[in-house]
Amino acid sequence: MKRLLAILATLLAVFVSKAQGQTSQQLPMTHMSGLLSLVETIPLPGDGYMDHLTVDVKGQRLFISGEAAKSLIAVDLRAGKVIHVTEGLSAMPKKPFYLSDTNEIWVTLTDSTVAAIDGNTYEVTKTVKLSGYGDPNRGADNAAYDPAAHLIYAGVEVFEDFGGSGQHGSNNASIDVVDTKTAQLVGSIKLPGGDPAGITIEPSGKRLYVTMGDIVRGDSHVAVIDLEKRAVVAQWPITGGPVPHTAGLDSAHHRLFVGSRMTAHTGDIGGGHQHEPGKLTVMDTETGKVVQSLDSVGGADDLQYDAATGRIYFVGTTGTVALFKEVDPDHFQLLGKVPTGAISKTGLWVPDLKRFYSAVPRHYVVTARHGTQDLQADLLKELNIAQGVTKRDKAAGWQTSMLSDLVIEEAHLMVFDYMP
């Protein structure tokens, strides 16, 4: 049963349709979208989810958090191949940062630590314990980095289990401050909630914006942190974006971008990852007011703003990146949606290279026996039904009809060129 659930949990709405006895596989993004052009696909190792990415522009290396495999993957972008995998990390890696001045990759880990990995040997050389270390209900996830101050601001979330359905706790989350020069924890800022999902920092290093995924009295909110005081100085309700999960910033025009899921990551398996549409909410950082809210792709997990082009890259776990355009600071429009890959939940826009990168984990591609308008929803429904299957049902030969034919698509890195 565990194997069945694991298989079903990774089945996505990428499928092979049968027509007149022929099997025709429809793989993600084999064409030009008019927004991004797929120019290269690089094989990647490992199973399971991957998380955030970071880049060494000068050395032409990309680093990928192998979340499920507890690894860090190093890719040579010039050669188009993986050059090293750092395995055996202490927990799941989440948000990495490449520090060019020390040639290190610093990454947050779900055991409430931050690790430094040497850029030459690819070995872990330093580990900083955060405030949640040793507490199974707390773990580090998203983070922001201030290169001028050499400080990492790591979000430590509170995660509890209620009868098999994971939910974030109501308080005791924090932003922990790590000095990368001394490899020391130098501060901890208490947050008004349990889920610091999205974190972005002003280039000046004066303010940090944290989108809190907690729903309090019907609203989610942004916690505004004064980094000199190291305290929350404001809380702004996010209308139009019920479950915020990521954040980006246009500091020149005082605009905060919030990527939201439309339902919490609880209850039925799939949770907020699979619900369409998601929401992009634009907020004024001078007033805290919502400027605009637009439909986007589901399962918001990453969001980046490119000042040179005025584009917003909104990445969802539904295997799509939505591109928005800043017409002016008060008006934004959806340019289009580009397929990335199944459960490719994050991506990285690199302005210096004018390229977008999407890491697609190894996943199952389904052969549908019958036509369906929403194969992914059907699979998730079967997964939830499968949770209730008893040993007696299993002995009687119960099985899910959706597992009749499976094709495995191996993990890979998709490399896209910018198109004006």
What spans do the regions from the language model cover?
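Positively charged n-region of N-terminal signal peptides that target proteins for export
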Residues: 1-4
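Bacterial N-terminal signal peptides
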Residues: 6-15
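Predominantly soluble domains enriched in secretory-pathway, periplasmic, or organellar proteins
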Residues: 19-420
